[in-house]
């Protein structure tokens, strides 16, 4: 009898600072792992955890916020390291603050990510009311050109199941690799990038 196999993918939570990436990371994990705060730049290094979903394993990565305007040397360094990290992912969960709508900054950062040729799922976060969702739906999202757009409220843990279902569906349709439980840890390549 062969060993049971699992679909495996590296999935990164990506976006500009202060859109709720770390809260979303914790929400998907179901426990507090990343530090969260109400000001930009809380996550300057990345966090990662293995998310076990029956026959599906996700190496979930919470990345530092990307900026379109790089003013300081530290901004440039963080952007470079984050983009190096993103280049090693299979799927990007691109997070937008739904209360802000589609801004020029989101478009500029998304364009940078798109050039890395990764599968992108658009996550509209901080959607605590139907009014916020309806207002966002009036925005022109055609620029992003992605089939998957999911509304979530990480703070209230809403929309998580939709994200998980979409991730599993994407991995199945795109033939991501299968690994056995015994070789999962060996097969999972560590992402050795640090921002100091």
Regions found by a protein language model. Give the residues of each.
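Conserved G1/Walker A P-loop phosphate-binding module
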Residues: 1-75, 79-85, 173-196
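Solvent-exposed alpha-helical segments within well-ordered globular domains of core cellular machineries
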Residues: 9, 26, 58, 80-87, ...
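Conserved beta-strand/loop subsegment of P-loop NTPase cores
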Residues: 59, 89-96, 113-128, 145-152, ...
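Conserved ATPase-coupling elements of RecA-like P-loop NTPase cores
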Residues: 69-73, 98-108, 131-136
């Amino acid at each position: 009898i062969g060993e049971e196999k699992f679909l495996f993918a590296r999935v990164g939570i990506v976006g500009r600072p202060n859109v709720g990436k770390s809260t979303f990371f914790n929400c998907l994990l179901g426990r507090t792992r990343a530090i969260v705060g109400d000001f930009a730049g809380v996550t300057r290094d990345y966090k990662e955890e293995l998310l076990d979903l029956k026959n599906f394993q996700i190496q979930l990565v919470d990345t530092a916020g990307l900026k379109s305007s790089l003013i300081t040397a530290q901004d440039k360094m963080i952007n470079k390291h984050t983009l190096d990290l993103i280049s090693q992912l299979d799927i990007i969960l691109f997070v937008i603050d739904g209360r802000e709508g589609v801004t020029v900054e989101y478009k500029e950062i998304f364009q940078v990510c798109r050039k890395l040729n990764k599968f992108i799922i658009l996550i509209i976060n901080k959607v605590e009311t139907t009014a916020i969702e309806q207002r966002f739906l009036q925005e022109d999202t055609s620029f992003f050109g992605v089939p998957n757009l999911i509304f979530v409220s990480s703070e209230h843990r809403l929309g998580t199941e939709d994200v998980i279902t979409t991730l599993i569906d994407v991995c199945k349709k795109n033939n991501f690799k299968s690994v056995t439980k015994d070789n999962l840890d060996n097969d999972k390549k560590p992402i050795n990038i640090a921002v100091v």
